């Protein structure tokens, strides 16, 4: 699940305009992006994953803020 991926791999989450930058451990970006894609959140237009960073693209800054908040809640739980 996306919650398990966040707890296992994510180190930080930060909004940048209509995007959310998700920092992960090395090699963690691909599984996190895949979990987010599979989740089908309506706020998320798509994801791009490198080795340790996921770029989550949203339709607008408000929706990016919602995604950042949701991810932070998962990270802090």
Question: What do these predicted ranges mean?
Answer:
Residues 77:
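Active-site phosphate-binding and catalytic loops of NTP-dependent enzymes
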Residues 1-74:
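Non-DNA-binding regulatory cores of transcription-related proteins
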């Amino acid at each position: 699940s996306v919650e398990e991926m966040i707890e296992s791999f994510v180190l930080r989450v930060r909004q940048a305009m209509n995007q959310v930058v998700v920092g992960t451990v090395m090699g963690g970006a691909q599984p996190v992006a895949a979990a987010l894609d599979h989740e089908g959140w309506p706020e998320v237009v798509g994801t791009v994953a490198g080795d340790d960073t996921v770029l989550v693209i949203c339709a607008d800054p408000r929706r990016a803020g919602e995604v950042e908040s949701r991810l932070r809640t998962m990270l802090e739980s």
